[in-house]
Amino acid sequence: MSAKSKLYLLAGLSFLAGNAMAQHICISTPNTSLVLNAPNGGELKYLSYGSKLSETDLQHINEASNCNHTAYPVYGMNCPGEAALSVKHADGNMSTQMEVVSVSTNQENQSTLTTIHLKDKVYPFYVDVHYKAYQDVDMIEAWTEIGHT
């Protein structure tokens, strides 16, 4: 195999691996969609919120999205605006950097509960971000649960 072929193969595999790691989450009500980017090991970000998106729109969300804001901004790391959370760790450090660990979705009566599990990259500090989308009204409920071990 030539060096050029190896380079193309490596680039293709890198592209596939990058796309496999990205996880878009669409939280929808009858007339609205909230789209989040939750890459495993990466930062939770808003991609879009507005009118309900079609499957075609969702497939092209990265190309059209100009909204790339942190969904749960924390104090201490890349937070130019107001932080949703500020923590002073046991060693006195106030830097917190949350990464996506996993995502779970559960169907409930007339609603879908999506939970994004976040963990600090250094400390045993956890945040669960919950979104509950109702299927009979245009309402998305959001709350967090914070834990430390």
Segments from the language model and where they lie:
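N-terminal signal peptide c-region/cleavage motif recognized by signal peptidases
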Residues: A17-N19
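Bacterial N-terminal signal peptides that target proteins for export
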Residues: M1-L9
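N-terminal accessory beta-strand-rich subdomains and adjacent acidic, glycine-rich linkers
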Residues: Q23-T149
